[in-house]
Amino acid sequence: MPTITQLIRKQRVKKSVKSKAPALAASPQKRGVCKRVYTTTPRKPNSAMRKVCTVVFTNGYECICYIGGEGHNVQEHGVLLVKGGGVKDLPGVKYHIVRGALDCSGVKDRKQARSKYGAARPKA
């Protein structure tokens, strides 16, 4: 523990908080244009073909985003809304596509957790 004299000589250094989603530039979501749509395999214990796409944001950043839900209509040059939040078993993927916003449609025939996938309320 430092003495008062040491603290007067040199103050304590504040720890800077590093952003988990730097490309969003402190915004909740950002708009971007899809550059490439492809599939990737997850890390070791899991096995699947995860749908991802490369997006160029309006601020110039470029990053890989995950497309959640079953089936999608994301195409090259499509305008997408992107939110933060990584995918645990996909290294380098730190963003999610917002389903049901801009050029990305919601998940069809989704009954539960509809708000997360932009699905319309089913007819009673």
From Swiss-Prot:
PROSITE patterns, A to Z: RIBOSOMAL_S12
Matching InterPro entries: NA-bd_OB-fold, Ribosomal_uS12, Ribosomal_uS12_bac
Gene Ontology biological process terms in this record: translation
Classification via CDD domains: Ribosomal_S12 (cd03368)
Modified residues (3-methylthioaspartic acid): D89
Keywords: Methylation, Ribonucleoprotein, Ribosomal protein, RNA-binding, rRNA-binding, tRNA-binding
GO molecular function (one): structural constituent of ribosome
One Pfam family hit: Ribosom_S12_S23
Ribosomal protein is among the record's keywords: yes
GO cellular-component term (any): small ribosomal subunit
Keyword rRNA-binding: yes
Subunit architecture: Part of the 30S ribosomal subunit. Contacts proteins S8 and S17. May interact with IF1 in the 30S initiation complex.
Similarity section: Belongs to the universal ribosomal protein uS12 family.
Function: With S4 and S5 plays an important role in translational accuracy. Interacts with and stabilizes bases of the 16S rRNA that are involved in tRNA selection in the A site and with the mRNA backbone. Located at the interface of the 30S and 50S subunits, it traverses the body of the 30S subunit contacting proteins on the other side and probably holding the rRNA structure together. The combined cluster of proteins S8, S12 and S17 appears to hold together the shoulder and platform of the 30S subunit.
UniProt-recorded name of the protein: Small ribosomal subunit protein uS12
Organism: Hamiltonella defensa subsp. Acyrthosiphon pisum (strain 5AT)
Gene: rpsL
